[in-house]
């Protein structure tokens, strides 16, 4: 199958860009963008490669994505080596095919076609690309956004190419994401012998009523755009491994995926009040990895919906479900942010794959979005 989008996707897959190693992917993208008149600014931080590229001026539409991928797992379980792209029955296999090298290829090819047809486009077209989205994300998009904000860079619209679709490309568009807040909580007791409990203070016993009450809380009921806030215990650890020692500490890690009905401060206040109610001795550490954001119906959402309806003849669902994405950082710039990408059924899995025809369709959708906003 010969197609510019498929060929570029295959070139990217062949580069084993395990986060945060870019493995030459960005050099390939930069070469293509510079060839059509983009100015490229490399913005590397520590071990992470990033770039910000732009063409034109005025109202700005940026396409954002990441070149890094997660580890492939056991390569012997793949139907072909994970970094050797292979097409079988119309499906393109390879690590990163769906998440998200296919989207990157579709973006670049769409830009090439758009510039060829609109060499004097009235708005500014931009790219924000990082090599660290899948791992810590500490030196990726967030650092680029901070640098752009410090110099008052303009960003009106941003399309993130994360694999948003469920069954066919464009059936789901993400116009927001929930916030994510993690609590690392240590309950302090006194270690001792299980035969002499009066000489110890068991933190597991002390914390049990607190945990029961915590998991029973209905944090909110969500709203028109967001499901109800969810709290899940992710890790819980105590004890020495011996059956005759009362542990001295209990560690509990729990995560909130929260809607716009709550703030992270409201969650913290409620958890701390509950700890005090149960008279626990504790230390606590919070990690806020992202605030919730929502892009309401407007020029970007309308352009994305129009592109999907035009090429796939379906009306996409606008959802805020799922995990976090780099859109949470970009939203800080005041931009309208939407995610549109391929089907996500196999992302991070053995035999990750994407329908090759979907990538061609995605490039056409991306081009139509460009034409509506910055032509």
UniProtKB/Swiss-Prot annotation:
Binding site for Zn(2+) 2: 99, 134, 348
Subunit field text: Homodimer.
GO BP terms: diaminopimelate biosynthetic process; L-arginine biosynthetic process; lysine biosynthetic process via diaminopimelate
Name the UniProt record assigns to this protein: Succinyl-diaminopimelate desuccinylase
Catalyzed chemical reaction(s): N-succinyl-(2S,6S)-2,6-diaminopimelate + H2O = (2S,6S)-2,6-diaminopimelate + succinate
EC number: 3.5.1.18
Cofactor: binding comment: Binds 2 Zn(2+) or Co(2+) ions per subunit.
InterPro entries in the cross-refs: ArgE/DapE_CS, Bact_exopeptidase_dim_dom, DapE_proteobac, Peptidase_M20, Peptidase_M20_dimer, Peptidase_M20A
Keywords: Amino-acid biosynthesis, Cobalt, Diaminopimelate biosynthesis, Hydrolase, Lysine biosynthesis, Metal-binding, Zinc
Binding site for Zn(2+) 1: 66, 99, 162
Requisite cofactors: Zn(2+); Co(2+)
An MF annotation (GO) of this entry: succinyl-diaminopimelate desuccinylase activity
SUPFAM superfamilies in the cross-refs: Bacterial exopeptidase dimerisation domain, Zn-dependent exopeptidases
Keyword Amino-acid biosynthesis belongs to the record: yes
Source taxon at top rank: Bacteria
Residues annotated as catalytic: 68, 133 (proton acceptor)
Assigned protein family: Belongs to the peptidase M20A family. DapE subfamily.
Gene3D superfamilies, per database record: Zn peptidases (3.40.630.10)
Entry function: Catalyzes the hydrolysis of N-succinyl-L,L-diaminopimelic acid (SDAP), forming succinate and LL-2,6-diaminopimelate (DAP), an intermediate involved in the bacterial biosynthesis of lysine and meso-diaminopimelic acid, an essential component of bacterial cell walls.
Pathways involved: Amino-acid biosynthesis; L-lysine biosynthesis via DAP pathway; LL-2,6-diaminopimelate from (S)-tetrahydrodipicolinate (succinylase route): step 3/3
